[in-house]
């Protein structure tokens, strides 16, 4: 990865959480400690961040997005990145798509930003997704407003729902906390309603979940598996789960 791409990647990571450590940069970019420090020095010299002990933070008065410990821990796992790459490969030039909130969908936004030669429109209710894509020259971007849920960085509620009802998408990409039997569930009913509307208004409906989400339960069931076109998951899905859930919809395993 050349220096220009490394610096772009570091800024993308900063946009998600507002702060970053040298260790996170080393792990994500597979570079040396010295290279990571030099890259941060270069970005600080350009006025794009402020160095801190062991890392850096964005030059912004805004409060960084609050995420749960689980979200922080799982943000850049290989499985989520692989799922995002597979989803990105299905998006065509000229598509209008919806991207919901969630760490796997943040990875999808990062994949889209790095892709060249495609012109698409993205509608999202996720602030982290918006912050990643808002300076892309090839993506027409629309952020749904509404009630803000800081824990996930998502806009929900009646305003978001009203705006979403008037929109149509070639593809919608959402996530879930739990998949069991024929049901898809999430913690927040308000987020579930938004994802339900987006799926209903899409020609192709995609659920992006890693294999740990199967045979789990959560509070609000917002969709049925047999209403989906495709589940995209990682290659660690068990043969039993693959057989069980394939009876409802198509399952694509990421490489």
Swiss-Prot record:
Does DNA damage show up as a keyword for this record? no
Q: Which UniProt keywords apply?
A: DNA-binding, Lactose metabolism, Plasmid, Repressor, Transcription, Transcription regulation
| Classification via SMART domains | DeoRC (SM01134), HTH_DEOR (SM00420)
Residue stretches making up the HTH deoR-type domain: 3-58
| Function of the protein | Repressor of the lactose catabolism operon. Galactose-6-phosphate is the inducer.
Which Cys pairs does UniProt list as disulfide-bonded? none
An additional note in the Swiss-Prot or TrEMBL entry is:
This gene was sequenced from pMG820, a laboratory-derived deletion of the naturally occurring plasmid pLP712.
List, alphabetically, the PANTHER family matched: GLYCEROL-3-PHOSPHATE REGULON REPRESSOR, HTH-TYPE TRANSCRIPTIONAL REGULATOR SRLR-RELATED
Biological processes, Gene Ontology terms:
lactose metabolic process
- Which Pfam families does the protein's record reference? DeoRC, HTH_DeoR
Q: What is this protein called?
A: Lactose phosphotransferase system repressor
Q: Which InterPro entries match?
A: Carb_Metab_HTH_regulators (IPR050313), DeoR-like_C (IPR014036), DeoR_HTH (IPR001034), NagB/RpiA_transferase-like (IPR037171), Tscrpt_reg_HTH_DeoR_CS (IPR018356), WH-like_DNA-bd_sf (IPR036388), WH_DNA-bd_sf (IPR036390)
Output the superkingdom of the source species: Bacteria
Give the GO molecular function terms: DNA binding; DNA-binding transcription factor activity
Mind listing where the DNA-binding region sits, in residue ranges? 20-39
């Amino acid at each position: 990865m050349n220096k220009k791409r490394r610096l772009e990647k570091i800024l993308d990571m900063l946009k998600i959480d507002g702060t970053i450590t040298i260790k996170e940069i080393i792990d994500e970019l597979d570079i040396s400690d010295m290279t990571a420090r030099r890259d941060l020095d270069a970005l600080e010299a350009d006025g794009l961040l402020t160095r801190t002990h062991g890392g850096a933070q964005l030059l912004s008065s805004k409060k960084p997005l609050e995420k749960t410990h689980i979200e922080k821990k799982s943000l850049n796992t290989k499985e989520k990145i692989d799922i995002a790459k597979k989803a990105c490969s299905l998006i065509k030039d000229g598509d209008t798509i919806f991207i919901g909130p969630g760490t796997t969908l943040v990875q999808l936004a990062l994949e889209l930003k790095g892709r060249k030669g495609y012109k698409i429109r993205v509608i999202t209710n996720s602030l982290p997704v918006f912050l990643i894509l808002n300076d892309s020259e090839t993506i027409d971007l629309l952020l749904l407003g509404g009630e803000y849920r800081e824990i996930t960085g998502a806009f929900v509620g009646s305003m978001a729902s009203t705006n979403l009802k008037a929109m149509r998408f070639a593809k919608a990409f959402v996530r879930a906390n739990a998949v069991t039997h024929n049901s898809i569930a999430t913690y927040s009913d308000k987020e579930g309603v938004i994802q339900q509307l987006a799926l209903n208004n899409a020609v192709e409906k995609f659920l992006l979940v890693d294999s740990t989400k199967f045979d789990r339960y959560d509070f609000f069931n917002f969709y049925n598996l047999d209403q989906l076109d495709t589940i995209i998951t990682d290659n660690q899905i068990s043969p039993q789960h693959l057989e069980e859930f394939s009876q409802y919809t198509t399952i694509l395993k990421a490489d």
